[in-house]
Amino acid sequence: KAIRAAGSRAQLVTLSNNASGGFVKALGDNAPGTIITQVFPNERSITSPLVKEVLALAKAKNITDLSPAMLEGFTSAKVLVEGLRRAGPNPTGDKVRAALEGIRDFDVGGLSLSYSPSDHTGLDFVDLSIIGRDGKFRR
């Protein structure tokens, strides 16, 4: 808001952790046109196995609109559960870390996720979305 209040018309770009309705609401009239990096497929992409899986679970809870943050949270939970499973029946922080760092080509709904002791990136997927005049994320 401060950038716009200062009169700047610069194109604003932010990270995926700001891909939420709360962020859009906080920006108010300044939200449209803001570009957000996305590390997951479009939440309306019904061809994505990940989106299909999340949509099915959301429908069961009467949730009709998915957000980019929901896809990230769901995937993070899925990866954590896999790390705990691989860590064994008595997980410790060290065991969970080693288990997560041993994940290679783990399918998280059509996306391949890998970690190593030196690379915690996970996914190589990147896309961009822009906030529309209606406050929705567009691709």
Enumerate the language-model features and the residues they cover.
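Extracytosolic ligand-binding ectodomains
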Residues: 1-139
